[in-house]
Amino acid sequence: MMASRRFKMKITIKKTDKPKPLPDSSSLGFGTLFTDHMFNMDYLPEKGWCNPRIEPYAPIMMDPATMVLHYGQAVFEGLKAYRTSKGTIQLFRPKDNFKRLNRSCRLLCIPELDENFLLDALNELISMEKSWVPAAPETSLYIRPTIIATDPFLGVRASNTYRYFVILSPVGAYYAAGFNPVKILVTKEHVRAVRGGVGEAKTPGNYAASLYAGARAHEAGYTQVLWLDGVEQKYIEEVGAMNIFFVIDDEIISPALNGSILHGITRDSVIALAKKWNYKMTERRISIDEVMDSHKSGKLREVFGSGTAAVISPVGELKYGEKNIKISDGKVGPMASRFFKALTDIQYGREKDSMGWIEEVCS
C-alpha cells in the first residue's frame, strides 16, 4: 500500500493532570517504566492516517476480536534518545528507523506512513517528555513506535483499520556490570525465519518464534542463540535479536541481507565505520563450518553482535554441536571495543558526528 500524500497534520495535545514522579536515573532497568504521555494516530480507509495526538499514557481498549490479537498483524521499531553532557537531547538515525518501519509495513500489508511526519511527531513528544531523558552515564530514553491491526473481525485478511502509537521508557546502562563477552549456542533444531517469509520485518511473530530456542539456550547456560538459515541450516543469519559480525584474519564479515535478516541500523553503522577506517569489510554468506574452521586454524579473531539495545555485544564463547570454542581468549576484542566506543561517543555527543547520523531534538 502506498503512503498517503505528504501534508502537515495538526497534532492535538492533552496533558496529564497526574504527572508521575521521575525515577532515579542511576537505578533504571529496561522497559518497566513509562513516561507521562504517548503519541497515537489512527488509520481509517476513508481518511488514511489521521487524528494524530499526544495524550496521557493509558491502556488501549480493544474488542476481544481485534485482529492483532488473533493473527499478529503488527510491526514495531526501537530507537533511543540520548542526553549529552551539554544537556541537549538527540536521536541516532531516526529517519532510518522510520524507513525500516515502512519496509515492515509493506511486508505485513499495513498502509505506509509519512516518515517526515513521524519524525516531527516524535520530536514533539520527546520535547514534552524531555525531563524523562535520564542523565546518568550510558542511560537513555527507549522509544517504541508500534502499529497494530484494529478491525474486530475473525476472518483471515489484512485489517482495514490500524493504530500507530509511540511509548517512551527511560532505561539504564545495558552494560551496568561492565562491557563483557557473552556465550552463544548454535541451534540447528530451530530457525528464526525462512526464505520468502517476513524475517526482514520487525514484526512480533519473529520474536515470539525465538522464545523457545532462547529459553533452551538459557537453561544450558548460554546468553543467546546463533541462528542458521532456514533452508540448508548452515549459513549464519543473526544472533539472538541482533545482527552479527566475524573478524577472520584482517577481514570483517557480516552475513549478507537476504530477505530473512533484519536491516539492522547499528549493523549498517558498523559497516559504514569499517569502510571509513579502511578495514576490509565484506557482506556475504558465511557458514558455521567456515567459522569453526577459521577458529581451528587460528584465524578467527573476534565475533560480536550489533543492535539498538546493546550497540555492540562481544562474543567470548560459542558452542556448536559437541564443540565449544573460546573467542579472543574469552575477552572483549579490539574491534568490538573500537566500534562500541565510536558509536556510543557519537550517540552521547562525546565526539563530533561526521556521518550525519544525529538528529537534535531539544535542550
How should these model regions be labeled?
Residues R5-S25, L33, G172, I184, ...:
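Conserved catalytic-core subdomain
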Residues R6, D42-W49, V75, Y82-G87, ...:
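Short acidic-glycine loop/turn motifs at beta-strand connectors
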Residues F7-D63, L69:
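Intrinsically disordered, low-complexity, positively charged segments
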Residues D24-S27, P94-N97, N102, R106-A220, ...:
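Extended Lys/Arg-rich, glycine-bearing segments that form polyanion-binding/interaction patches
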Residues T32-Y43, I54, M67, P181-L228, ...:
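Active-site-adjacent loop/helix segments that line or gate small-molecule/cofactor pockets in enzymes
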Residues D63-K80, A309-S313:
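Conserved phosphate/anionic-ligand binding catalytic regions in large, soluble enzymes, centered on
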Residues D114-N116, W132-S140, V225-L228, N278-I288, ...:
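Flexible, glycine/charged-enriched surface loops at secondary-structure junctions
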